[in-house]
Design a protein with these regions (language model features):
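Glycine-rich phosphate-binding/hydrolytic loop that grips phosphoryl groups
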Residues: 186-217
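Residues at secondary-structure transition points
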Residues: 30-38, 69-73, 77, 94, ...
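DPxDG-like acidic metal-binding loop motif
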Residues: 61-90
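Surface "functional belts" at beta-alpha junctions
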Residues: 22, 34, 89-190, 217, ...
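Patatin-like phospholipase
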Residues: 6, 11-29, 168, 207, ...
Length: 235
């Protein structure tokens, strides 16, 4: 079975094509969240490079979050539309799990973090594996709270940090953890679409109808939070 995987949850947009679980094409671009413009051309290129026609895709996958609210919606909406048009099922993939899957050759506790703004990170923790072994659930917390929870499950392990949150919080992480902190190099920090495709393939028996594929948010979008604050202020 052929699979098309899409990620637009962060600053890097990516598309992968898989044939029976093997990656036939992977492409990604740092495009400053202009995913609505670039995604469909990237999908067309992925299909062409993988030697696939859209009619040959049997399963679609999208990263459902956490991540940029707008970015996640773009990828999920694109996959829902393609799956609906083709009458094919979908698989949602967790962004933090996919990040961890890209760091499978380490004995450290894998700590994917994304900059959630407002002084928070989206974070979780995993041990290496495919799929990764989850040690902490997804959370939206201030960095110190997240680090406390990661340390509580790390045991004697070092902690390996990756994801776009590293750029924002690297100094704070190193200051808190010292030599226990392993900062992934830049080329390993971002989510790879091939990891999305491989996780989707492993979960293909859990595929759903396009109507059931939905973004997964760890907190309300900023506009909703601001509206709630305004309404609360009037009470």
């Amino acid at each position: 079975m052929n699979l098309l995987a899409v990620d637009t949850s962060g600053p890097v947009a990516g598309v992968a094509g898989l044939k029976d679980g093997e990656v036939a094409y992977e492409g990604a671009a740092v495009n400053r969240l202009t995913h609505s413009v670039n995604l469909m051309p990237m999908i067309e290129e992925a299909l062409g490079r993988a030697g696939l026609d859209v009619s040959e895709i049997g399963l679609y996958a999208a990263v459902t979050g956490p991540g940029s609210f707008t970015g996640v919606r773009i990828g999920v909406s694109a996959v829902k539309g393609m799956a609906h048009g083709a009458g094919k099922p979908c698989v949602g993939v967790d962004a933090l799990e996919a990040l961890a899957a890209g760091a499978c050759l380490t004995d450290a506790l894998i700590c994917p973090i994304q900059d959630a703004r407002a002084g928070q990170v989206y974070g979780a923790a995993f041990l290496a594996g495919m799929p990764p072994v989850r040690m902490l659930p997804n959370m939206a917390e201030a960095l110190p709270v997240y680090l406390d929870r990661a340390l509580a499950v790390a045991g004697e392990r070092r902690l390996c940090f990756l994801g776009d949150g590293v750029s924002t919080y690297r100094d704070a992480i190193v200051e808190r953890l010292g030599e226990r902190a392993v900062i992934a190099p830049a080329h390993m920090r971002y989510l790879r679409p091939a990891s999305v495709g491989e996780l989707a393939w492993l979960n293909r028996e859990r595929s759903v109808d396009y109507l059931a594929l939905m973004p997964v948010y760890l907190r309300a979008p900023q506009a909703e939070r601001e509206r709630a604050r305004r309404l609360g202020g009037r009470a």
